[in-house]
Design a protein with these regions (language model features):
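Asp-based, Mg2+/Mn2+-dependent phosphohydrolase catalytic module
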Residues: 3-114
Length: 114
């Protein structure tokens, strides 16, 4: 079993409303926003804040994201493994000559990793 946490470059009220109305709020133990952390992805600070709130370490964490220059680069900056959910192409993407730890093309493929 995994704990899910959310890191978003959004405002507290907006992100919590989205989670509530989508029915996803109960799945996430911690929700870290750029507003609450005073930092934006891909900066390491928002990830460090999330680690502190979740009482987690980079070594036991993984970032699942669909934006290579925000989610994946942020995870690389924070020293955690990443899963790039690539909805745009069927070719793996890189950022700053670095490849994500994993690339999937649909959320269903996450089952193969976890």
């Amino acid at each position: 079993k995994y704990q899910l946490h959310l890191i978003t470059n959004g405002f507290e009220k907006t992100q919590h409303s989205k989670l509530k109305y989508s029915g996803l709020a109960g799945y996430f133990k911690e929700v870290v926003t750029s507003e609450g952390s005073n930092s934006l992805k891909p900066n390491r600070e928002i990830f460090d804040y999330a680690f502190q709130k979740a009482k987690a370490t980079p070594e036991e964490s993984i970032m699942i994201g669909d934006t290579i220059d925000v989610d994946i680069l942020g995870a690389i900056n924070a020293g955690i493994d990443q899963v790039h959910v690539n909805h745009l192409t069927k070719e793996p993407l890189t950022i700053n000559d670095k490849s994500p730890t994993f690339t999937v093309y649909s959320l269903k493929e996450l089952e193969e990793i976890f």
